[in-house]
Amino acid sequence: MSIDLSTAQSIITKALETGQQHGFKPLTVVVLDAGGHVIAVARQDGASNNRFEIAQGKAYGAVALGMGSRALMERAEQQAYFITAASAALAGRLIPVPGGVLVRDEAGTIMGAVGVSGDSSDNDEIAAELAIKASGLTAQVA
């Protein structure tokens, strides 16, 4: 099962609300289905340019490799050659820093991923993780 539009929009709303509640810089949030296709995206007023591409890259890498982008960052630190090769295989659409969080259902099946960009990578990840959990789904950051 993949994320539907209604769920994607709910996740986006909750991520943006989380950012506002925590005083984060303006965010861009992208929700992808299990195949890496964009379901929904929102960019807050004032978010800097290219945040869509960064958020999408965080989410795309997560869903493509089956791990949160924090785990991808850790993998890049340990095995840079793997991330370089994976990035090439994914046509450069992999951004291995926190902020790309897998979405799993109650059975543990990957439903898609959420990518957030706009503040620090750690804060981006917080917004994604809390939004996924608030939507009743499981967030996998690592």
Labelled PLM ranges:
Residues 1-142:
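Flexible, solvent-exposed loop/hinge segments and secondary-structure transition points
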